Amino acid sequence: MSLKKKIAAAFIACAMTLAVVPSAFACTALYVGSDLTEDGTTMFGRIEDLGTNDYNKLFNISPAGKHTAGEVYEGCYGFTYTFTHDSYRYTARRDDNGLGVCPDCDSTHEHTPYEEAGTNEKGVMVSATESLYGTDAVLSVDPYVDNGIEEAEITTVLLSEASTAREGVALLTSIYDNAGAAGGSGVFIADQNETWFVENLTGHTYLALKLSSSVVFMQPNIAAMGKIDLDDTDHVVASANLISVAQKAGTFVGDAAANVIDLDASYNGDIASDRMAAGLNYLYGTDTFTKDNYSETDFAISNVGENGAIVPVYSNIQLTKKFSVEDSIHFFQTEPIGKTGNVETHLFQVSATGDLNTAITEWTAFDDDVYNAFVPYYPMLTTDTADVYKVSVHKVTRSDEQPTEGVWYQDAKGRYYTYPDDWTDSFYGVRDALSNLLTYGSNGNQVTAKDRAAAKASYAALQQEIMADYADMKAAVAAADPLEAKQAAATNASNAMSQKVYNTTLKMYNKLQAKTAARAWVSSLLH
């Protein structure tokens, strides 16, 4: 069983008994409708969290035709899928199996490891997944399917196959109907015209909702959907058994006669989260929320109005201002949403008007968002990603004993991690190394609060540089002609920004390593 599967199994057991969210699998998603943003774009994205990670992440382009019509794809854990046409080209953030072993399933068979998010050549965007967990009661009626689709396959299959968001929704829900799901999840599927969010909490149930332009919601591993009228067929796609499974489990909350279900209450229960409280404080511009003084059901998504009528989707979260892309970035940087357990973060910014080639911007970041700068890419124009995103490196070595050589750190649970010699050659590796140095120190040497403040300030300044670079990139792309010139302008600009983040991070890491070692040497002389 892989690390992710083990963590997920432990999470389910914990959630069933204690109804708390451990940090090891603690992703957080955000959606802000276009009516609520400064420039009228829709913004949505997610942080992938994995506690203390020991393997590399990549960001690359999956070429068109990587999978061929009729090819049977075998995923990590037994799920198979037959491609209906040659696969589309798409951007992808993914786990690194470049040295032959998949870090998800520990397998060497040829397959694409977990891909978290991306955009295909048709302009379809997928973010998968926000891990969700049904209660033991509903899972006893409709359990997860061992060889059903799992998060490691969702992005790969949907971006390879779907030409519109609705096609993606139809494909994913048909897979849930037939093959089933290996786990619960929340998935964004979008195109230039619409954004859908799909939640499943058992093996074969699901609810897909077309999101409105006037809603904002966040999701820290809890079902985001509350009271939903399933008769709103223009905006809702639901499994035929959604109500009946909850009824059989004895957990149904809603009005079956009116075809209304409270999904969160029926399938997920009320789970306290310090990330939800922190996110609400950020969105409201206050510090009054704690995980003990709110109910996440108060902020769940609904399409049912006060009089029971179907209304545009809302969440009861009220922003204090129109959001900019920097506001969305700062949301992900808010602790404990941002933390050393972050693995990668992606934020899609989508304009409903204009040329599709520039209507979608992917903002990408790796590792700890507290100390980070996000880089923009035009996925429809990008022909390649920066070389530092594509470097395969060895895994970090874990141990219960203090290492006697190499560069290592000890995490909060007392476990030791030693970096391979090539770790900082990759974009993810150097970002991870700096984050762990700022959080845990290195080789027993600690950093100071002043060091952490300086790192935050450096990344804040770097983000402002990137925002200026992004403005220059937009102007250069607009002026370029023909299409090949636009592609070159976009690709070169984004890759230069990525290289700038890498170079800055490596310099900060090496400087801070030397500083902590010097402090330790001086301290040893004094004592």
Located regions from the model:
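Bacterial N-terminal signal peptides that target proteins for export
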Residues: 1-11
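Sec/Tat signal peptide C-region and signal peptidase I cleavage site
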Residues: 6, 21-26
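Bacterial N-terminal signal peptides
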Residues: 11-19
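A contiguous strand-loop segment
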Residues: 27-150, 171-296
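Long, well-ordered mid-to-C-terminal structural blocks that present hydrophobic/aromatic surfaces
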Residues: 294, 299-401
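Charged low-complexity "KEKE/polyampholyte" interaction tracts
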Residues: 369-370, 379-527
